[in-house]
């Protein structure tokens, strides 16, 4: 049976509970389209997150890697198309969980400018919508640890020539986090809805390696 590695992050910044962690933990051990899901929570820190994911890939030998993170302010699940070779969290007023602030620094000075996700992004979004979960394609994964890890994993797989497909899914805040005073008005999504959406996305990624060709309606501009 093939395996799917799902990664998530724990709390960070002013986010006391991360939907990526809860969703990853909920999916751990499930079977989706004949594949076993194995979840790992990786450090929400630059570089250590990549090292932890690389170790998990070596141990688990997955056919597919789906990385999860939170994107506050987005009202839908978003499947990322690109990962950039740049880290710039100072503009968010954020440091990683080790207190590190990177401003305009590359993940790998010798690496390419960006990588495309190797999962069928549009097909995954369409599958989520058919499951009743709002979702869209995103062309910008940010410049914090989410984008950093996505780039690092895709770079690692490319450098090693591993036959593993990988992609990133961003989740809205949890309702309990959106209810905090400093987040009032921020969109949110329950863990149950996030799990349903991610499950549909993983199933689509397992069932087809090539993306669908027809366009899908989109409202997200980034």
Curated annotation (Swiss-Prot):
Its main location: cytoplasm. The keyword Iron-sulfur does not apply. One of its GO terms (cellular component) is cytosol. Gene3D superfamilies: Peptidase C15, pyroglutamyl peptidase I-like. Keywords: Cytoplasm, Hydrolase, Protease, Thiol protease. It comes from the Bacteria. GO terms for biological process: proteolysis. Belongs to the peptidase C15 family. NCBIfam families: PRK13195.1, PRK13197.1, pyro_pdase. Homotetramer. HAMAP family: Pyrrolid_peptidase (MF_00417). This is Pyrrolidone-carboxylate peptidase. The gene is pcp.
